[in-house]
Design a protein with these regions (language model features):
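Short, hydrophobic beta-strand segments that form beta-sheet elements in well-ordered domains
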Residues: 1, 70, 81-84, 164-168
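A glycine-rich helix->loop->beta "capping" turn
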Residues: 201-206
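Short glycine/threonine/proline-enriched tight-turn/helix- or strand-capping micro-motif at secondary-structure
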Residues: 9-21, 50
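Mid-domain Rossmann-like dinucleotide-binding core that forms the NAD(H)/NADP(H) cofactor-binding site
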Residues: 118-197
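Short polar catalytic/cofactor-binding loops
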Residues: 2-8, 37-39
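NAD(P)H dinucleotide-binding glycine-rich loop of Rossmann-like/cofactor-binding domains
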Residues: 62-69, 80-144
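Glycine-rich beta-strand-centered segment in the early N-terminal region that forms part
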Residues: 21-39, 47-90
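Short, glycine/acidic-enriched capping/hinge loops at junctions between secondary-structure elements
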Residues: 10-12, 43-47, 148
Length: 206
């Protein structure tokens, strides 16, 4: 559980493990065994108050998505062994409504269901292709390019024929963007010359 709302940096004291009786699903519900949870930056924002969801409350299970396996089903739409992504919170077992959930394929590795095919991947895909709508040949600068969303944005942009310039903190992250992910260039914002570097690399004003 989230035992205390943090006012500064997160620490072990803000969380507490508890053992409780395993919940029992009612009609239309599923008992899930949580396999993986993502540690997203959004989780920290929820601790600071209401965002796109209500703020968290101390003493309750830490909120969050979970990739889970159905243990017991009280819904005709799911069977034990099915995989789903649901609002499970940070716990080993959770009971959730079956309505609105979809059965997921068993990919390898399973963690891709929470990353590339999860919220980060969907945010990158629709944010880039439906909102930004870059055109082939354009230069696209990606902030937080070494993060979950930014790293996927850059790769999709490259596939769509854009020149991609990533912005990240530190030489190692910048090297990873270029060598491993195929970014055309990467800028280290920690150098203190980001504005000049961005103008030069993206040829702004030419």
């Amino acid at each position: 559980v989230l035992s205390e709302l943090p006012r500064t940096a997160l620490a072990v004291r803000h969380f507490q493990g508890r053992e409780v009786r395993c919940p029992v699903p009612a009609d239309g519900e599923l008992l899930l065994r949580v396999l993986y949870i993502p540690l997203d930056a959004a989780s920290r924002a929820w601790m600071q108050g209401a965002t796109y969801r209500p703020g968290l409350v101390a003493g309750e299970v830490m909120a969050g998505l979970g990739l889970a396996e159905v243990v017991e089903s009280r819904s005709a739409s799911f069977q034990p062994g099915d995989l789903v992504c649901a609002e499970t919170g940070w716990q080993t077992f959770a009971v959730v409504p079956a309505a609105g959930l979809i059965r997921l394929p068993r990919l390898e590795p399973l963690t891709h269901l929470l990353s590339v095919y999860g919220v980060a991947g969907l945010t990158a895909y629709f944010g880039l292709l439906e909102c930004a709508r870059p055109v082939q040949g354009e230069t696209l600068a990606v902030s937080a390019a070494a993060g979950a969303v930014g790293s996927i944005v850059g790769q999709i942009a490259r596939i769509r024929g854009c020149r991609t310039v990533g912005i990240a903190g530190g030489a190692s992250k910048c090297a990873w963007l270029v060598r491993e992910l195929g970014f055309d260039a990467a800028l280290d914002y920690k150098t203190g010359t980001l504005a000049d570097d961005l103008r030069r690399t993206c040829q702004i004003g030419r």
